[in-house]
From Swiss-Prot:
Entry annotated with the keyword Transmembrane: yes
Annotated region (Required for TMED10 and TMED2 cis-Golgi network localization), positions in chain: 147-178
Protein's UniProt name: Transmembrane emp24 domain-containing protein 10
Segments for region (Required for interaction with STX17): 1-142
Gene that encodes the chain: TMED10
GO molecular function: protein transmembrane transporter activity; syntaxin binding
Source organism: Homo sapiens
Length: 219
């Protein structure tokens, strides 16, 4: 029995529309929250590309009611220990800086006090790159229409993706060069070891031959 046949089904524009909606729509950024016990230190680390704007907002709740001299300290550093942002008695605020190189950045919260004090609740919302740009402010300054703002956002996002791929390609080339260099060194070391073993074996043969001749065990 032959089944009914008809024209092949055509895919609608839903996937493309969904992709455009994801790219053009506001990006969802979730804040990080954690509890900070008294006299403790917690740090968050993140790798960020060079020449990127990094912004953040933080809030540290104080449930001690001012008891125990509770103080909180926020410090942001790079891998070399350079301080990019520091705030004593931090409770709530914002920070911003621009990265000079691809690096590992560390955001540290430290709590100091005395007595039995409840843990502090720390909320951190950190953005970088396209997420950190204030497109509403850009639209006001440059007098852009809503569609132009979304196109600007898409352009920046596309540029960010291209830069990410370029960096990944560069890292892949560096890793390949490192592997080739390591393989070459291993090959040279293996050849050197082989010659050393051959030389040692030859020396042992001549040494044993002279020893046995001295003992008159062989002619």
């Amino acid at each position: 029995m032959s089944g009914l046949s008809g024209p092949p089904a055509r895919r609608g524009p839903f996937p493309l529309a969904l992709l455009l909606l994801f790219l053009l729509g506001p990006r969802l950024v979730l804040a990080i929250s954690f509890h900070l016990p008294i006299n403790s230190r917690k740090c968050l680390r993140e790798e960020i590309h060079k020449d990127l704007l990094v912004t953040g907002a933080y809030e540290i709740s104080d449930q001690s009611g001012g008891a125990g001299g509770l103080r909180s300290h926020l410090k942001i550093t790079d891998s070399a220990g350079h301080i990019l942002y520091s705030k004593e008695d931090a409770t709530k605020g914002k920070f911003a800086f621009t990265t000079e190189d691809y690096d590992m950045f560390e955001v540290c919260f430290e709590s100091k006090g005395t007595g039995r004090i409840p843990d502090q609740l720390v909320i951190l919302d950190m953005k970088h790159g396209v997420e950190a740009k204030n497109y509403e402010e850009i639209a006001k300054v440059e007098k852009l229409k809503p569609l132009e703002v979304e196109l600007r956002r898409l352009e920046d996002l596309s540029e960010s993706i291209v830069n990410d791929f370029a960096y990944m390609k560069k890292r892949e080339e560096e890793m390949r060069d490192t592997n080739e260099s390591t393989n070459t060194r291993v090959l040279y070391f293996s050849i050197f070891s082989m010659f050393c073993l051959i030389g040692l074996a030859t020396w042992q043969v001549f040494y044993l031959r002279r020893f046995f001749k001295a003992k008159k065990l062989i002619e």
